[in-house]
Amino acid sequence: MLGVSNIWSNDKGLADFITLSKNPDNVVVLVGMSDAQVKEYSSSTYKDCNLIPIQRTQNQHELSMLYSLADIHVNPTYADMFPTVNLEALACGTHVITYRTGGSPEAIDDKTGVVVEQGNVDALADAVRKMKANPLSSESCRKRAEECFDKGQCFEKYIELYQSLTNQ
């Protein structure tokens, strides 16, 4: 499973990922770790964790490759309004499991991911297990990203809205 953040903290679900990584069936790859975090989470202190800490990628291509290679993108955020990491995962054909936080649930539907209650790590782990056992179609993720979050279509809707407001 993949987690991506610009800055990793418990607000971004870091502690929950540590819990998930203690299950021998899970391998957790976290992208965006600082140098200090890479060193810390690679140390013997975390030897019971299946955790692979990675620094920020060098470009969008590297990041999209990581999303595309992942079975699942997990976003156990506690403090996001509408996280772009969910949209990035969908655009790369990767399913999303996220907490019911801010706009996270709006990015996905029942064909593209699962939403669990914020802070319920057991439900998060169960959703990961179920999705591994019964993967969803990656094409459904790409389709949702293109149909719902294409910037060209979104810009057109904004322009139409602004025009309707100025014509009143």
Enumerate the language-model features and the residues they cover.
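Conserved donor-binding/catalytic core segment of Leloir-type glycosyltransferases
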Residues: 1-12, 18-23
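Nucleotide-activated donor-binding/catalytic signature segment of Leloir-type glycosyltransferases, i.e.
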Residues: 32, 39-58
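A short hydrophobic beta-strand element within the catalytic core of glycosyltransferases
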Residues: 73-74
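Aromatic "clamp/platform" in nucleotide-sugar-dependent glycosyltransferases that forms part
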Residues: 78
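Conserved acidic donor-binding segment of nucleotide-sugar-dependent glycosyltransferases
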Residues: 110, 114-121, 130-135
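A short, well-ordered alpha-helix in the C-terminal region of glycosyltransferases
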Residues: 136-148, 157-160, 164
